[in-house]
UniProtKB/Swiss-Prot annotation:
Annotated segments matching region 11 X 6 AA tandem repeats: 90-146
Subcellular location: Host nucleus, Host nucleolus; Host cytoplasm
Function summary: Plays a role in the inhibition of host immune response. Participates in the inhibition of host autophagy by interacting with and inhibiting host PKR/EIF2AK2. This interaction also prevents the interferon-induced shut down of protein synthesis following viral infection. Downmodulates the host RLR signaling pathway via direct interaction with host RIGI and IFIH1. May also participate in nuclear egress of viral particles through interactions with host NCL and regulation of the viral UL34 mRNA.
GO cellular component, one term: host cell nucleolus
Source superkingdom: Viruses
Name recorded for this polypeptide: Probable RNA-binding protein
Sequence repeats by residue range: 90-95, 96-101, 102-104, 105-110, 111-116, 117-122, 123-128, 129-130, 131-134, 135-140, 141-146
GO terms assigned for molecular function: DNA binding; protein serine/threonine kinase inhibitor activity; RNA binding
Gene that encodes the chain: US11
Length: 151
């Protein structure tokens, strides 16, 4: 058993040309390295879908592009006709409103007279502090109920 591998997930051998990675994250024999390891102009086929058009085709796959993001985006974005649906809530038919009757203008408001200033509250004298509690004496133990009722 290799160190760091749990028994629930045994390490499976990775064959040549396999797209899987081993648990340690090393590329299999058939995979081309990506990123900094790749040569800029190498002639080997790269991972990803084949190029559809020329260099300027926006839908063509980039080197190292699996195309999965573009496929998922194409499947998950609804068309505008699907996105704007009439609501299923039945609406009451609109009743035409009566035309508004113009009202006569209001008289201008008379500003209120300022209120009288409040009389400040006179604070009461604080209460005298309570005397400290004196602990009571414990009560004598009571006799059991059975003997009390018979006497």
């Amino acid at each position: 058993m290799a160190s760091g591998v749990s028994p629930a997930h045994p390490q499976t051998p990775v064959g040549a040309g396999s797209r899987d990675l081993s648990l340690k994250g090393t590329p299999s024999d058939g995979m081309q390295p990506r990123g900094a390891d790749t040569l800029e102009g190498h002639s080997l086929p790269t991972d990803g879908p084949p190029h559809r058009g020329g260099d300027h085709d926006p839908a063509a796959g980039k080197r190292g592009d699996s195309g999965l993001l573009r496929v998922c985006a194409a499947l998950s974005i609804p068309k505008p006709s699907e996105a704007v649906r009439p609501s299923r809530i039945p609406r009451a038919p609109r009743v035409p409103r009566e035309p508004r009757v113009p009202r006569e203008p209001r008289e201008p408001r008379v500003p209120r007279s300022p209120r009288e200033p409040r009389v400040p509250r006179i604070p009461r004298d604080p209460r005298p502090p309570r005397p400290p509690r004196v602990p009571r004496e414990p009560r004598p133990p009571r006799e059991p109920r059975a003997t009390r009722g018979l006497a």
